[in-house]
């Protein structure tokens, strides 16, 4: 029996992701062909909140796998300052679960008017963002009842992954086992974290990632703030050592998220610095060496580093949910938040 919409939608994700991985692959390849005909020289991604973290994930994918320079737009350039940058050779991707935030819609519409090819990734095919775009990649995960983004966030990660792999001419079969990987990762989080909290609500939390784990770290920190009212902040493992490590001390909890791969040594360096400052650590990873060094570890399963963010995010959502529930907080009613946020 589930106790909240957030829990229900976390549990629903393995099946939804498996369906999206299979069902959206042909559309991703069709969109990649349409994009190829325009020969974009660079990509601009625009989003807010959780979707902005999915956009950062997209930046890593686009630059690493597709060889395209990718940047994140500042929506106020279009929506407040009335700027019109030269985007004639760009692919502009708007990411929004609702597709209704005016600043994201204005950015995409302005870029389209300026000659860019535009694409919307959204859970609402009839939304203003979808209507403002040349191309659309729908998430099709059904209405999201949880105020804090759960299934739409991991679906955005998968949608971006499918699109970029198709743009790069790569095989999409790596996602074939995504549903079972997500299910195994969620089960691992449930075994390790159910009934757990991150300790004293007054103590700070740092969430650390690198590479594909970095946007997941930002997202987990946001979830801990949203549903747990935590003083949580996300950092790159590299940036952590450029100053923020000074604020880490005994009583601080550090959550490290990342997959086995080229960033592992950087994450281990960050974890060593965290321990040297007297903080306790929780590691979410498929890297046994990184997990071995943690105070507590949640092993996850992923088919390669570029897909790992989905399993990492799913385990992180369960952590945020459990931290809120064990302290008597209602994850479906975080104060001051609304499901659809409209900013200019």
Which residue stretches match the model-derived regions?
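Peripheral docking tails and interdomain loops at the edges
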Residues: 302-344
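Active-site phosphate/pyrophosphate-binding segments
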Residues: 2-40, 135-253, 263, 327-344
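Glycine-rich phosphate-binding loops that contact phosphosugars or nucleotide phosphates
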Residues: 36-184, 210, 245, 253, ...
